[in-house]
Regions:
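Soluble non-cytosolic domains of exported or imported proteins
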Residues: 39-47, 92-96, 136-149
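Short acidic low-complexity segments
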Residues: 58-69
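Surface-exposed short loop/turn segments
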Residues: 72-118, 122-137
Length: 163
């Protein structure tokens, strides 16, 4: 009986502090009622941004002359740079994975509200040749996480310029 109360109290404390599992957040309301998204070489980001905006209540439409705002995403690139090398073996110990994407927002007259702004997010991870498969999976997971982070930044930026 006491264990049940202790478990209930622990769950209440955990939820009260704002903890939630990554990827389970419910998107907050967006300031944009309607938005067109044009993707020029940024398919992963465009899909994620569209999804986050729709969860926030934004209707995604096709770009046209009547569209009030158009978000253009370009040049989605992942870079993997060496962060550290082992002094003994000369082999890579750490990498830094960076995602860059260019964004711009225009109004209904084609006037830029946000003009060619680059959003970048980086994460580093250790590399071990003895577990290449595991590290490959870790890199894939990091790439997905970077896409979510950049997309969230873009949504926040779009919200900020449409207040």
């Amino acid at each position: 009986m006491h264990l049940r109360y202790l478990l209930l109290l622990s769950l209440l404390a955990l939820s009260a502090c704002g903890f939630h599992l990554r990827g389970t957040q419910v998107a907050s309301r967006t300031n944009v009622s309607e938005l067109a998204i044009k993707s020029v070489s940024a398919p992963l980001i465009a899909e994620q941004v569209s999804s986050q905006l729709q969860l926030g209540g934004t209707r995604i439409v096709e770009p046209s002359d009547k569209t009030r705002r158009v978000l253009t995403l370009r040049n989605e690139t992942f870079d993997r740079d060496v962060l550290s090398v082992s002094a003994d073996t000369g082999k890579v110990k750490e990498y830094q994975l960076t995602l860059h994407v260019d964004m711009s927002v225009t109004d209904s007259k084609g006037k830029p509200v946000v003009d060619n702004e680059t959003i970048s997010v980086s994460r580093d991870y250790t590399f071990d040749e003895s577990s290449i498969l595991g590290k490959s999976n870790e890199e894939t997971s990091l790439r997905e996480d970077l896409v979510r982070q950049v997309s969230a930044q873009i949504v926040r930026r779009v919200n900020a310029v449409t207040k």
